[in-house]
């Protein structure tokens, strides 16, 4: 068995190391596998932030919904409000983010979200996490 990601017809990987560019990342692919396209997009976003900043603050949180929605417009509105506040509060010009809507049927609809900011301007996540709760 190699340590490279194996991709099947469903564009899922089942190995424990995800190879992206020249780097390998340890991942928990689990029994259901890893969605390759979103993983690549996330790593591209992290690398873009690191190419502009020597340190990046990554804040990861879940956004839970009370009821099902047929689209993701709520994330667009959330981003607009959060980014406006973050730019005003911290004076950052570049904000990285990734999100993924959970597809499980047994649980309530929710989003996994990661916000990436210049760590030379944002030292602690407390104010941001409070604002996330307020906006959501």
Regions found by a protein language model. Give the residues of each.
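Histidine-centered divalent-metal-coordination microenvironment in nucleic-acid enzymes
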Residues: 97-120
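Alpha-helix boundary/N-cap detector
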Residues: 30-37, 73, 77, 127
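Charge-rich, low-complexity segments
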Residues: 1-53
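Signature for HUH/AEP ssDNA processing cores
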Residues: 44-103
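Helical (often loop-to-helix) elements that flank the catalytic cores of nucleotide-handling enzymes
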Residues: 116-136
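Catalytic core of pol beta-like nucleotidyltransferases
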Residues: 83-88, 106-109, 126, 130-133
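Acidic, low-complexity intrinsically disordered regions
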Residues: 21-22, 95, 132
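Eukaryotic short linear interaction motifs
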Residues: 68-70, 106, 121-123
């Amino acid at each position: 068995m190699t340590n490279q990601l194996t991709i099947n017809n469903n564009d899922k990987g089942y190995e424990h190391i995800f190879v992206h560019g020249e780097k390998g990342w340890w991942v928990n692919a689990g029994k259901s596998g890893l969605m390759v396209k979103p993983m690549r997009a996330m790593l591209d976003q992290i690398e873009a932030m690191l190419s502009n900043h020597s340190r990046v603050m990554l804040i990861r949180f879940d956004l839970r919904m009370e009821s099902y929605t047929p689209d993701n417009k709520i994330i667009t509105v959330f981003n607009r409000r959060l980014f406006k506040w973050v730019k005003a509060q911290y004076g950052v010009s570049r904000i990285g983010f990734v999100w993924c809507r959970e597809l499980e049927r047994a649980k309530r609809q929710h989003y996994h979200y990661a916000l990436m900011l210049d760590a030379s301007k944002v030292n602690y996540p407390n104010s941001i996490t409070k604002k996330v709760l307020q906006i959501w």
